[in-house]
A protein has these predicted regions:
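Metallocofactor- and cofactor-centric catalytic cores in central/energy metabolism, strongly enriched
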Residues: 1-360
């Protein structure tokens, strides 16, 4: 029962991540969010697998239908086909899952059912509980991971291979230093884009800084780095307090998952401004600037990003004279590998497969 509950918890974590990106994709397709849809190639490729018609239709119309299909798999209440599994899972695997009776109805349904059957006096059969555990696993994979990946590439474009200095020694002195921490890309995309504009470069210089530098903590760091040149990955969630302890960060922008409350205690020691952006993840003592519970202010994404950037500029001014120590530990990393970037680099997967077979 506890294992099933843990699986349901993991499903909701990644399912919530997928939900926000899918809401953003649908909003952008319906002109309710002023963000360009950059992943046309990804959208048109995936739509073929889902049998979504394209001929004579605009990119936004096709993107809207794709978002609807993925949202339906997230939240379907009536039993029906899990379309992402049908479209993207190998046929032999689907047959095995069907025979085992572990095909999910939807991400919402499997999390809901997992908590229902593991409550007092309900499912006492370990095999039945393990079936639900596996249903949660499939919903986690095909909505929490696959759908989230499709929607991210569809809205923000596919990241490319990049080479960068990483680790704690990559921190820079003299800049307005902003860390983005978490998993949700919509608001982060605008913070990074607007923060790199000439307008905000001039604002930073006006307060004596060399510019604005972004750093990635956890998954937001890597996701942002693939797409925006001015983001340096520093560490995973476990290293967050160590990074704050350098005294180099002016502002810490956190959304959801892997954001531990202890960062507030360390940030307070160095006057680092902490801003939360998700209604689902508040921190005591942090300022909250983000979407409301119903996402009624999604259209205000750029205004929210500007407000956060302005807070970072204010924090930089207030922190002048704060002792900073940056340990000299950094390495060069190459990141941003994907099937598409691999094919673009090698022409196909054949050279890579041959190298693996030849143990090269």
């Amino acid at each position: 029962r506890n294992m099933t509950r843990a699986a349901a918890g993991g499903l909701t974590q990644h399912g919530a991540h997928a939900r926000e990106i899918l809401i953003s994709l649908k909003a952008a397709a319906n002109d309710q969010l002023d963000i360009p849809i950059l992943g046309e190639e990804k959208i048109r490729t995936v739509c073929k697998a889902f049998n979504i018609p394209e001929e004579g239709r605009s990119l936004k119309e096709v993107a809207n239908d794709l978002a609807d299909v993925l949202l339906e798999d997230l939240s379907r209440a009536l039993p029906g086909e899990y379309k992402t599994i049908t479209a993207l899972a190998p046929a032999e695997r689907r047959e095995v899952w069907k025979n085992l009776d572990i095909l999910p109805i939807s991400a919402y349904n499997e999390a809901f059912d997992a908590y229902h059957r593991t409550c007092v006096g309900t499912d006492g059969d370990w095999e039945s509980n393990m079936k639900q555990f596996l249903r949660c696993g499939l919903a986690f994979t095909f909505t929490g991971v696959v759908a989230a990946d499709i929607a991210t590439d569809a809205l923000f474009g596919q990241g490319g291979r990049r080479t960068s200095k990483v680790n704690i020694g990559a921190l820079k002195k003299g800049y307005v230093n902003i860390a983005v921490h978490g998993h949700l890309p919509t608001l982060v995309s605008q913070i990074c884009t607007i923060g790199a504009s000439e307008e905000y470069l001039e604002k930073a210089k006006a307060i004596g800084a060399k510019g604005i530098q972004f750093y990635g903590i956890c998954c937001s760091g890597l996701s942002s780095m693939y797409r925006y040149e001015n983001v340096i990955p520093l560490c995973n969630a476990i290293g967050a307090e160590l990074v704050l302890g350098t005294g180099a960060l002016d502002c810490w922008v956190a959304d959801v998952q892997d954001v531990y409350p202890a960062i507030m205690d360390v940030a307070r020691c160095f006057n680092t401004k902490v801003i939360t952006t998700s209604d689902a993840a508040r921190l005591p003592g942090a300022e909250h600037i983000g979407y409301d519970h119903h996402h009624t202010n999604l259209a205000e994404t750029k205004e929210l990003a500007r407000k956060i950037l302005d807070r970072a500029l204010e924090a930089h001014e207030l922190r002048k004279g704060m002792p900073v120590f940056i340990p000299p530990y950094e390495i060069t990393a190459e990141v941003g590998f994907s099937p598409e970037s691999t094919v673009k680099h090698y022409g196909s997967f054949k050279p890579l497969a041959e190298a693996l077979k030849d143990r090269k």
